[in-house]
A protein has these predicted regions:
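Small-residue (G/A/S/T)-rich helix-start motifs and N-terminal tracts that mark the onset
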Residues: 1-106, 115-132, 137-266
Length: 266
Protein backbone atom coordinates (compact mmCIF):
# COMPACT_ATOMS: atom_id res chain seq x y z
CA UNK A 1 0.00 0.00 0.00
CA UNK A 2 1.38 3.43 -0.95
CA UNK A 3 1.67 5.78 2.02
CA UNK A 4 0.03 9.20 2.08
CA UNK A 5 3.28 10.83 3.20
CA UNK A 6 5.60 8.53 1.22
CA UNK A 7 8.36 9.82 -1.06
CA UNK A 8 10.80 8.24 -3.50
CA UNK A 9 13.10 7.19 -0.68
CA UNK A 10 10.22 5.31 0.91
CA UNK A 11 9.91 2.97 -2.05
CA UNK A 12 13.50 1.98 -2.57
CA UNK A 13 16.57 3.26 -4.36
CA UNK A 14 17.99 0.60 -6.65
CA UNK A 15 21.03 0.31 -8.93
CA UNK A 16 20.90 -1.59 -12.22
CA UNK A 17 24.25 -2.73 -13.63
CA UNK A 18 22.87 -3.74 -16.99
CA UNK A 19 23.10 -3.39 -20.75
CA UNK A 20 25.86 -3.00 -23.32
CA UNK A 21 26.17 -1.79 -26.91
CA UNK A 22 24.68 -4.99 -28.36
CA UNK A 23 22.02 -5.50 -25.67
CA UNK A 24 20.66 -2.06 -24.93
CA UNK A 25 17.09 -3.30 -24.73
CA UNK A 26 17.78 -5.49 -21.70
CA UNK A 27 18.74 -2.49 -19.58
CA UNK A 28 15.81 -0.43 -20.84
CA UNK A 29 13.22 -3.12 -20.17
CA UNK A 30 14.57 -3.93 -16.70
CA UNK A 31 14.63 -0.25 -15.70
CA UNK A 32 11.12 0.48 -16.93
CA UNK A 33 9.78 -2.67 -15.25
CA UNK A 34 11.31 -1.58 -11.94
CA UNK A 35 9.88 1.93 -12.24
CA UNK A 36 6.43 0.60 -13.12
CA UNK A 37 6.59 -1.87 -10.21
CA UNK A 38 6.89 1.05 -7.81
CA UNK A 39 10.57 1.76 -7.17
CA UNK A 40 11.23 5.23 -5.84
CA UNK A 41 14.48 5.70 -7.76
CA UNK A 42 16.13 3.51 -10.39
CA UNK A 43 19.71 4.31 -11.44
CA UNK A 44 21.15 2.53 -14.48
CA UNK A 45 24.92 2.15 -14.67
CA UNK A 46 25.73 1.41 -18.30
CA UNK A 47 27.45 2.65 -21.44
CA UNK A 48 26.70 5.83 -23.33
CA UNK A 49 24.51 4.20 -25.98
CA UNK A 50 22.24 2.65 -23.35
CA UNK A 51 21.98 5.89 -21.41
CA UNK A 52 21.09 7.87 -24.54
CA UNK A 53 18.26 5.43 -25.24
CA UNK A 54 17.15 5.36 -21.60
CA UNK A 55 16.17 9.03 -21.58
CA UNK A 56 13.59 8.31 -24.28
CA UNK A 57 12.37 4.86 -23.22
CA UNK A 58 12.23 5.50 -19.48
CA UNK A 59 12.85 9.15 -18.56
CA UNK A 60 11.94 8.43 -14.93
CA UNK A 61 15.19 6.47 -14.45
CA UNK A 62 18.51 8.15 -13.65
CA UNK A 63 21.84 7.01 -15.04
CA UNK A 64 25.58 6.81 -14.58
CA UNK A 65 28.07 6.15 -17.37
CA UNK A 66 30.11 2.99 -17.20
CA UNK A 67 33.52 4.68 -17.29
CA UNK A 68 32.69 6.28 -13.95
CA UNK A 69 32.13 4.15 -10.89
CA UNK A 70 33.10 4.21 -7.26
CA UNK A 71 31.67 2.74 -4.09
CA UNK A 72 29.80 5.96 -3.32
CA UNK A 73 27.33 5.11 -6.07
CA UNK A 74 26.11 2.19 -3.98
CA UNK A 75 25.69 4.20 -0.79
CA UNK A 76 22.05 4.42 0.18
CA UNK A 77 21.00 1.81 -2.36
CA UNK A 78 18.45 -0.76 -1.20
CA UNK A 79 19.02 -3.34 -3.96
CA UNK A 80 21.13 -4.06 -7.02
CA UNK A 81 20.31 -5.82 -10.27
CA UNK A 82 23.37 -7.02 -12.14
CA UNK A 83 23.79 -8.86 -15.42
CA UNK A 84 20.81 -8.25 -17.70
CA UNK A 85 22.37 -7.66 -21.13
CA UNK A 86 25.67 -6.76 -19.47
CA UNK A 87 27.85 -8.49 -22.07
CA UNK A 88 30.71 -10.94 -21.60
CA UNK A 89 34.22 -9.52 -21.65
CA UNK A 90 37.15 -9.10 -19.29
CA UNK A 91 35.92 -5.79 -17.92
CA UNK A 92 32.43 -7.03 -17.11
CA UNK A 93 33.81 -10.23 -15.58
CA UNK A 94 36.19 -8.30 -13.37
CA UNK A 95 33.48 -5.89 -12.28
CA UNK A 96 30.91 -8.60 -11.50
CA UNK A 97 33.44 -10.49 -9.40
CA UNK A 98 34.47 -7.34 -7.56
CA UNK A 99 30.93 -6.26 -6.81
CA UNK A 100 29.68 -9.68 -5.73
CA UNK A 101 32.74 -10.17 -3.52
CA UNK A 102 32.23 -7.02 -1.51
CA UNK A 103 28.72 -5.63 -1.62
CA UNK A 104 26.45 -5.91 1.37
CA UNK A 105 23.44 -4.67 -0.61
CA UNK A 106 20.84 -7.31 -1.63
CA UNK A 107 21.43 -8.40 -5.23
CA UNK A 108 19.42 -9.88 -8.10
CA UNK A 109 21.84 -11.80 -10.34
CA UNK A 110 20.61 -12.28 -13.90
CA UNK A 111 21.78 -12.96 -17.44
CA UNK A 112 25.48 -12.53 -18.13
CA UNK A 113 26.28 -12.15 -14.43
CA UNK A 114 25.04 -15.73 -13.97
CA UNK A 115 27.45 -16.91 -16.67
CA UNK A 116 30.30 -15.12 -14.90
CA UNK A 117 29.24 -16.45 -11.51
CA UNK A 118 29.28 -20.01 -12.88
CA UNK A 119 32.95 -19.48 -13.79
CA UNK A 120 33.70 -18.30 -10.24
CA UNK A 121 31.71 -20.61 -7.94
CA UNK A 122 33.88 -19.59 -5.00
CA UNK A 123 31.85 -16.38 -4.88
CA UNK A 124 28.81 -18.41 -3.87
CA UNK A 125 30.62 -19.63 -0.77
CA UNK A 126 31.38 -16.22 0.69
CA UNK A 127 28.76 -13.64 -0.23
CA UNK A 128 27.88 -10.93 2.28
CA UNK A 129 24.32 -10.04 1.28
CA UNK A 130 21.05 -11.60 0.17
CA UNK A 131 21.21 -12.98 -3.36
CA UNK A 132 18.42 -13.84 -5.78
CA UNK A 133 19.55 -15.87 -8.80
CA UNK A 134 17.28 -15.95 -11.87
CA UNK A 135 18.55 -18.67 -14.25
CA UNK A 136 16.60 -20.49 -16.92
CA UNK A 137 17.16 -24.23 -17.13
CA UNK A 138 20.18 -23.95 -19.42
CA UNK A 139 21.87 -21.41 -17.17
CA UNK A 140 21.20 -23.51 -14.09
CA UNK A 141 22.96 -26.46 -15.75
CA UNK A 142 26.17 -24.43 -15.61
CA UNK A 143 25.97 -24.70 -11.83
CA UNK A 144 24.39 -28.14 -11.34
CA UNK A 145 24.25 -31.18 -13.60
CA UNK A 146 20.86 -32.85 -13.98
CA UNK A 147 19.19 -34.95 -16.67
CA UNK A 148 15.53 -35.23 -15.65
CA UNK A 149 13.11 -32.49 -14.66
CA UNK A 150 12.36 -34.38 -11.45
CA UNK A 151 16.05 -34.20 -10.55
CA UNK A 152 16.07 -30.48 -11.27
CA UNK A 153 13.61 -29.73 -8.46
CA UNK A 154 15.71 -31.57 -5.88
CA UNK A 155 18.89 -30.00 -7.21
CA UNK A 156 17.35 -26.53 -7.06
CA UNK A 157 16.36 -26.97 -3.42
CA UNK A 158 19.77 -28.36 -2.51
CA UNK A 159 21.56 -25.54 -4.35
CA UNK A 160 19.53 -22.81 -2.65
CA UNK A 161 20.05 -24.39 0.76
CA UNK A 162 23.78 -24.97 0.30
CA UNK A 163 24.58 -21.45 -0.85
CA UNK A 164 21.95 -19.55 1.15
CA UNK A 165 20.37 -17.95 -1.92
CA UNK A 166 16.89 -17.58 -3.34
CA UNK A 167 16.63 -19.36 -6.67
CA UNK A 168 14.15 -18.36 -9.37
CA UNK A 169 14.36 -21.23 -11.87
CA UNK A 170 12.58 -19.85 -14.91
CA UNK A 171 10.45 -22.00 -17.19
CA UNK A 172 6.89 -23.29 -17.47
CA UNK A 173 5.54 -22.82 -13.93
CA UNK A 174 8.69 -21.18 -12.64
CA UNK A 175 10.12 -22.79 -9.51
CA UNK A 176 11.25 -20.66 -6.57
CA UNK A 177 13.22 -22.02 -3.64
CA UNK A 178 15.10 -20.60 -0.70
CA UNK A 179 16.26 -24.06 0.35
CA UNK A 180 13.54 -24.37 2.98
CA UNK A 181 10.34 -23.82 1.00
CA UNK A 182 9.57 -24.35 -2.67
CA UNK A 183 6.89 -22.67 -4.78
CA UNK A 184 5.57 -23.20 -8.29
CA UNK A 185 4.22 -20.06 -9.94
CA UNK A 186 1.16 -20.91 -12.01
CA UNK A 187 0.68 -17.57 -13.76
CA UNK A 188 2.22 -17.03 -17.19
CA UNK A 189 1.67 -18.61 -20.60
CA UNK A 190 3.34 -19.96 -23.72
CA UNK A 191 3.00 -16.63 -25.51
CA UNK A 192 5.65 -15.20 -23.19
CA UNK A 193 8.50 -17.10 -24.83
CA UNK A 194 10.04 -13.98 -26.33
CA UNK A 195 13.09 -11.76 -26.01
CA UNK A 196 13.32 -9.44 -23.03
CA UNK A 197 10.92 -11.37 -20.83
CA UNK A 198 13.64 -12.37 -18.37
CA UNK A 199 14.99 -8.82 -18.21
CA UNK A 200 11.50 -7.60 -17.37
CA UNK A 201 11.15 -10.19 -14.61
CA UNK A 202 14.54 -9.28 -13.14
CA UNK A 203 13.54 -5.61 -13.08
CA UNK A 204 10.30 -6.35 -11.24
CA UNK A 205 12.02 -8.55 -8.66
CA UNK A 206 14.73 -5.93 -8.09
CA UNK A 207 12.02 -3.35 -7.48
CA UNK A 208 10.31 -5.42 -4.80
CA UNK A 209 13.65 -6.31 -3.20
CA UNK A 210 14.50 -2.60 -3.02
CA UNK A 211 11.08 -1.82 -1.54
CA UNK A 212 11.96 -3.97 1.45
CA UNK A 213 10.42 -7.34 0.66
CA UNK A 214 12.33 -10.38 1.88
CA UNK A 215 14.20 -12.06 -1.00
CA UNK A 216 11.83 -15.03 -1.16
CA UNK A 217 8.77 -12.77 -1.10
CA UNK A 218 10.22 -10.42 -3.72
CA UNK A 219 10.92 -13.40 -5.98
CA UNK A 220 7.48 -14.97 -5.53
CA UNK A 221 5.45 -11.78 -5.85
CA UNK A 222 7.56 -10.51 -8.76
CA UNK A 223 7.27 -13.74 -10.71
CA UNK A 224 3.54 -14.05 -10.03
CA UNK A 225 2.89 -10.45 -11.10
CA UNK A 226 5.03 -10.90 -14.23
CA UNK A 227 2.97 -13.93 -15.22
CA UNK A 228 -0.35 -12.20 -14.52
CA UNK A 229 0.64 -9.27 -16.72
CA UNK A 230 1.60 -11.70 -19.46
CA UNK A 231 -1.73 -13.49 -19.10
CA UNK A 232 -3.57 -10.19 -19.48
CA UNK A 233 -1.71 -9.39 -22.71
CA UNK A 234 -2.23 -12.94 -24.01
CA UNK A 235 -6.01 -12.59 -23.80
CA UNK A 236 -6.01 -10.46 -26.95
CA UNK A 237 -2.68 -11.36 -28.57
CA UNK A 238 -1.09 -14.43 -30.15
CA UNK A 239 2.36 -13.47 -28.90
CA UNK A 240 3.33 -11.53 -25.80
CA UNK A 241 6.15 -8.98 -25.94
CA UNK A 242 7.99 -7.65 -22.92
CA UNK A 243 7.10 -3.99 -23.42
CA UNK A 244 3.39 -4.84 -23.36
CA UNK A 245 3.86 -6.86 -20.18
CA UNK A 246 5.49 -3.84 -18.54
CA UNK A 247 2.57 -1.62 -19.53
CA UNK A 248 0.26 -3.90 -17.53
CA UNK A 249 2.23 -3.72 -14.27
CA UNK A 250 0.59 -0.68 -12.57
CA UNK A 251 -2.96 -1.77 -13.39
CA UNK A 252 -2.34 -5.34 -12.28
CA UNK A 253 -0.74 -4.19 -9.03
CA UNK A 254 -3.80 -2.03 -8.37
CA UNK A 255 -6.07 -5.05 -8.88
CA UNK A 256 -3.96 -7.26 -6.62
CA UNK A 257 -3.89 -4.64 -3.89
CA UNK A 258 -7.69 -4.40 -3.95
CA UNK A 259 -8.13 -8.18 -3.84
CA UNK A 260 -5.26 -9.56 -1.79
CA UNK A 261 -7.23 -12.69 -0.93
CA UNK A 262 -6.87 -13.73 -4.57
CA UNK A 263 -3.09 -13.98 -4.22
CA UNK A 264 -2.50 -17.69 -3.52
CA UNK A 265 0.63 -17.33 -1.39
CA UNK A 266 -0.34 -14.46 0.93
Amino acid sequence: ERLYDGHKGTYGRIMHVTGCYHYRGAALLAAKAAVYAGSGLVTVWSNEKVIDSLSLFCPEATSCQRHYFDEHLLQGKDAILIGSGLGLNEDSERFVCELLSHTQVPVVIDGDALTILAKHPELLENHHSSWILTPHHGEFKRFVDFKQTSEMVDQANAFAKKYHVTLVLKGPHTLISDGNETYRIMSGNKGMSSAGMGDTLAGIISSFLGQGYLPKDAAILGTYLHGLCGDEVYKENYTVVASKVIDQIPQMMKKLNKNRSAIPFL
